[in-house]
Swiss-Prot record:
Residues 1-31 are annotated as: Disordered. One of its GO terms (molecular function) is structural constituent of ribosome. Pfam families: Ribosomal_S20p (PF01649). Binds directly to 16S ribosomal RNA. This is Small ribosomal subunit protein bS20. It comes from Acidobacterium capsulatum (strain ATCC 51196 / DSM 11244 / BCRC 80197 / JCM 7670 / NBRC 15755 / NCIMB 13165 / 161).
Amino acid sequence: MANHVSSLKRARQTVRKTAVNRANKSRVRGSLRSLREAIQKGDVKAAQEQYKATASALDKSVQKGILHANTASRYKSRLNARVKALATQAA
């Protein structure tokens, strides 16, 4: 356990920041899950709408330092390819 005043403060800050980071990461994972479920169901319109929300959540997570920019870009690229494939398959 921390003994110095500064280390006690850092411990408190870590607890708060961990909670915020966990909530943000959970939000991104939930958005990804919703998009994958929409793709799995084959609902093109829902998948396209959910992709917009997911891309936004990924971009926000990059700004907050939750994900690396390349990781978010990779997710968006792969998910967009799946949504486009679903749209062309349905058409």
